[in-house]
Amino acid sequence: MTTDSANTARPSDDRAFFGHPRGLSTLFFTEMWERFSYYGMRAILMLYMTTAVATGGLGWSAADAAPIYALYAASVYFLPLIGGWIADRFIGAKRATFVGGVIIMLGHFTLAFPMMPTFYAGLILVAVGTGFLKSNISAMVGDLYEKEDERRDAGFSIFYMGINIGGFLAPLICGYLAQNSQFRAWIEGMGFDPNTSWHFGFACAGVGMGLGLVQYVIGRRNIENVGNVPQAESKSVVDESAKPDAPTQDSGYIVKMVVIIIAAVAIIGFAAVSQGFSYALSYVLMPTVVIAALIGVFITGTQDKLTRDDWKRLAVLMILFLFSTIFWMGFEQAATSFNLFADKLTDNRIFGWEFPASWLQSVNSLLIVIFAPIVGAVWMYLGKKQPSDAVKFSLGLLFAGIGFLVVAYAASLTVGGKVSPLWLVLVYFFHTIGELCLSPVGLASMTKLAPARMISLMLGVWFLSISLGNYVAGMIAGEFVADAAVLTRIFLIVAGVLVGAAVLLFVISPLVKRLYTTPQEMVPVEPA
């Protein structure tokens, strides 16, 4: 078979990668390396900011570092909304993914230079690059399959496995380079300042993204028919004279795109270099973004003339949005409060050998690989008796709350000295089970309940909940101090919020189910 014929074959005929389209291999490894770069930097970022200057860090307090981390983490999940919009209208998902990867790589390499201007610039570049790559590479995975292709769900499972492989390996490697005393001694022997070990960790993240870009370029012929530039079209007729790669020409959209990019970068940059502004933004950003999202959903729904049932389903999605934000507020303490807890209050030794605190960031990804098939099998076994989406959400919140009760107890034990890392492993176990109950269900609900014309918008709302959760998580980390009583109180408060939210959602779950179930749908059916 010639290359041309291979590229024009129906997607259902392409089974070159473990029974899936060969393009999945290209996207699998690209995402694996991109997540390697993200989780590698994430594992050491908060630690770098709060480590003493004498040992290579910035020497900031948790209160000073938290707003910077919060703004960065929120941007990583907010900017994909803009990146997806740009790709849909101008450059296509394929080009957006490549551009995003290049910007991410440059961001990590910029962080590798031990200067304050490069620190801020690197964070901005990584956030902007992620905005271009994150949503678009997932969209291309979906485009590899025809609508009714039964391999689609399995394909996404393989794709997400790549995410977790990258998430598992990155903290181990980048964390070793950043924190290991033997590596510090080795680079000192090579003539480097041992305090630059943190920047070797950042550079390693950049190398990971670089490897992802190399194999993305090599494998581009495998994704020739997905993620291309949108073609110019009228309401009913496509201009056949338009070139396949010609982007839509709309000066209004271009102006809006430029304004949005400049505004986003300006806000992130100014907030980054002004910690006072970051604090102020924390009290303005969340209400503003939530209100804007609600207004956007309402305006879109009004323009699309939604039915009464559509509005009910949108109400359900906004309820799930609220509880999703609360969940991620707790879950994303992993990179902030829990990371600081691991660094300052945990005895990170195995048989006398001390391992970097950042290594504990690998636990979640490892547990997902182990337990995702088990949780999926439980839902399959229950069949039509499995709990509703709202109840699964409440279970996710409950498990996250239990995790915080565990870490609160562990914090109370630190009055007598450092505690075993197994406490954090147990916390991550509960949080992982909670994530598996909530995250897949939330994403599926957005596509299942949203009106057809609003699916992209509601997927954006889902990522917005993760963005806001990250922001709140970062701000809570600003309260971290190595004091048993203070930490116990903070963790108990978060546990109370999570468990309270779980109970509330469980109580109203019958009402939520009735909102998105029409009389015809009340007949029991096998779950999709």
What kind of region is each of these model predictions?
Residues 89-101, 148-149, 310, 380-398:
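Cytoplasmic membrane-interface "Motif A"-like loop-to-helix N-cap segments
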Residues 32, 107, 118-133, 321, ...:
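Hydrophobic core of transmembrane alpha-helices in multi-pass small-molecule transporters
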Residues 78, 218, 286-298, 353-383, ...:
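Transmembrane alpha-helices of Major Facilitator/SLC transporters
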Residues 66-87, 134, 168-170, 362-375, ...:
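Central cavity-lining transmembrane alpha-helices of secondary-active solute carriers
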